[in-house]
Structure formats: structure tokens, C-alpha cells
Swiss-Prot record:
Family: Belongs to the SmpB family.
GO terms of molecular function: RNA binding
Locations listed in the record: Cytoplasm
Superkingdom of origin: Bacteria
Stated role: Required for rescue of stalled ribosomes mediated by trans-translation. Binds to transfer-messenger RNA (tmRNA), required for stable association of tmRNA with ribosomes. tmRNA and SmpB together mimic tRNA shape, replacing the anticodon stem-loop with SmpB. tmRNA is encoded by the ssrA gene; the 2 termini fold to resemble tRNA(Ala) and it encodes a 'tag peptide', a short internal open reading frame. During trans-translation Ala-aminoacylated tmRNA acts like a tRNA, entering the A-site of stalled ribosomes, displacing the stalled mRNA.
Organism: Chlamydia abortus (strain DSM 27085 / S26/3) (Chlamydophila abortus)
Main location: cytoplasm
Name of the molecule in the record: SsrA-binding protein
Amino acid sequence: MASKEIVSNRKALHNYEVLESLEAGIVLTGTEIKSLRDHGGNLGDAYVAISKGEAWLLNASIAPYRFGNIYNHEERRKRKLLLHRYEIHKLEVKVAQKGVTIIPLGMFLSRGYVKVRLGCCRGKKSHDKRQTIIAREKEREIASAMKRYR
């Protein structure tokens, strides 16, 4: 079954260099899932913290469900990520390196469950960002030139 992306963190790919990525489940309430299906999420300031052998998604904004009642969820609450123990240990080792952090790259639906795509990332400097933009534009020019001369 195909997975459907519902929230993406496009700014993360601009500001960070992704070293490694993996998928994790997430513990959500019913109104959070309904809100995410309406594309009511934002991962702009979100990051992952590991404490006491558990991974937590912090600062991820899921808009309150518009048809929710008094039991609606908090917008920026701490959400637990579902990972195996060895995956959490691997992430802890990566984060121990200088300048590496764990950023959510996107959320998607897979078989009715919401999954989070995580990335071990290192921050880019401004000149690295410029080099990435220049390389992307060169690839675009080459592709258009190849398309013209076929």
C-alpha cells in the first residue's frame, strides 16, 4: 500500500544536510489524527529529544481539530515516538557527535497509521546553502538543454 505524505518540513532540507533517515511511529490522540488528515500540521520548529531511553517529538504543531469538543488536544504537546531500543541507541550515538541533531522531515500515512520520517542532520553554513542552490540550478539547466536537443 502506498504511503501518503500529509506534512513535510521543506525548510529542514534547506537548512540541514541529512546524514541518515529512518521512519518512526508516533503516539497520537484521535483529534490529532483527524487534524493531520486535514493537513493541519507544521514541523517548522520541531526536533527530537531522547530522554530516559525514549524518543520524544517536541515543538511539532498539530492544529486543533475544527470539529473537536472540549477534549481537543494541545497544539504543541510532547509526543512519544515509537522506535526499537537499538534504533534509539543508534540515534543517541549520532546525536553525541558535535553538530548533529534529529529533525522530523515529514509525516505520512501508512496503512492508516501516522509515521514520522526522521533525519540525523547537520546544520549547513550559508555558503553551503548557496552551493546547493547553484548545483540545483545547473542540473535544471542541463535537463532543459537535453530536453530541447532531443
